[in-house]
A protein has these predicted regions:
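C-terminal auxiliary extensions adjacent to catalytic cores
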Residues: 366-385
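Conserved mid-domain beta->alpha element of the FAD-binding
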Residues: 9-39, 156-157, 183, 241, ...
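Conserved N-terminal helical subregion
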Residues: 2-9, 51-186, 190, 225-242, ...
Length: 385
């Protein structure tokens, strides 16, 4: 077998997955160029938890410490009822110490900034999205939104839920609506919020998550069973959320009161059913472009990070492109697709409305010892590809 030790990788999308791939390829000595639709990487009001399995992947490319320094590590994690009563807890501080790996809660834009710095801003082309491609078997040419084109050895679609690369590779297929919408915001810390305490509260057809992300900020999110396509009138999002969640336990009302209405983002939650192929020829997919999932396990960005690290290892192996992409899929597809399915099922369980069903669910969760839940996290970390 002839090893291909020099190749240029085209990456569609400067999200977490695309930038992580660019970092990993640069570290491996390969050339990568990232093409991003947005004309600037803005501070969008959302946070992300880099779970321990993703931190393990980042350590393989030398980025774990830099990411950890930019965020905050939680000491405790719990699922609660609207009254504040505990359904279950996870001893995350103990697990971080045991596994020697951090869990990092961080502003999404801050994570993106760390990745951009290590990828090299000079390798990112803003305001130029990949809109199509042609693979001639020897090279792949990507068409860009400004009418130009660029040729490389590999094209990676890391362009998200509505990926143009995926559309060209697998065709158009409808998104699957979860049955619930979401709101996200960043609040300044409030006195009623416990430092280091991450929580998700389950109410009737609604949830509220609280995630301290460091730098005096708290990321929060809310979900509500609702038809797709709903919109809030300007200035009304916070009022509506306070009507729904204002009677829930602290610090939820205080976080909503401290968040400007124009800093609240609403998004319907979709995924796509898992597929059995991500690649064809010299083109492959990564992250939400390959396996978009609901956010219930907190694994969307984490699986994109895992994808990126594994794909970089496969491309750096020197194997022919098609063989490298086949190995990437073999290492990643089953794990990522399992996350899609598990996250979907958890969302349906967490969004229950029936009082009887919720009572039974909460009672069953209380019967599960925290040691068993912790074992599941350990297995996830230790099985990272």
């Amino acid at each position: 077998m002839i090893l291909e030790t020099s190749r240029h990788v085209l990456i569609a999308g400067a999200g977490i997955g695309g930038l992580t791939l660019a970092c990993a390829l640069r570290r491996a000595g390969l050339t990568a160029t990232v093409f991003e639709r947005a004309d600037a990487l803005r501070w969008v009001g959302a946070g992300i938890t880099v779970q321990m399995n993703a931190a393990v992947a980042l350590r393989r490319i030398g980025l774990c410490d830099a990411v950890a320094a930019a965020g905050a590590s939680p000491t405790d994690s719990a699922i609660l009822q609207p009254s504040g009563a505990t359904i279950t807890r996870l001893p995350v501080q103990q697990m971080q110490q045991e596994l020697g790996t951090p869990m990092v809660c961080i502003h999404r834009a801050r994570l993106q900034s760390v990745l951009l710095e290590h990828a090299g801003p000079e390798h990112v082309r803003l305001g130029r999205a990949v809109t199509g491609f042609k693979d001639d078997g020897h090279q792949v040419t990507a068409t860009l939104s400004d009418g130009s084109s660029v040729t490389g050895d590999v094209l990676v679609g890391a362009d998200g839920l509505r990926s143009a690369v995926r559309s060209g590779l697998l065709g158009d297929a409808p998104l699957r609506y979860s049955g619930y919408t979401s709101w996200r915001g960043i609040s300044p810390e409030v006195p009623s919020a416990r430092p280091g305490h991450v929580s998700e509260t389950w109410g009737p057809g609604a949830r509220f998550g609280v995630v301290p992300i460091g730098s005096g900020q708290v990321y929060w999110y809310a979900t509500l069973n609702a038809p797709p396509g709903g919109q809030d009138t300007p200035g009304a999002a916070r009022t509506r959320l306070r009507e729904i969640f204002g009677g829930w336990h602290a610090p939820i009302p205080d976080l909503l009161a401290a968040t400007p209405d124009d800093a609240i983002v609403r998004t319907d939650i979709h995924d796509r059913p898992p597929v059995n192929r991500w690649s064809r020829g010299r083109v492959t997919l990564l992250g939400d472009a390959a396996h978009p999932m609901t956010p219930n396990l907190g694994q969307g960005g984490c699986q994109a990070i895992e994808d990126a690290v594994v794909l970089s290892e496969c491309l750096a192996s020197g194997a022919p492109v098609e063989a490298a992409l086949a190995t990437y899929e073999q290492r990643r597809r089953e794990r990522a697709n399992q996350m899609v399915s598990r996250s979907w099922r958890l969302g349906q369980l967490a969004q229950l409305e029936s009082p009887t069903a919720r009572f039974m669910r909460d009672a069953l969760f209380r019967l599960v010892p925290s040691s068993l839940a912790a074992r599941g996290v350990r297995d996830l970390v230790r099985s990272a590809a």
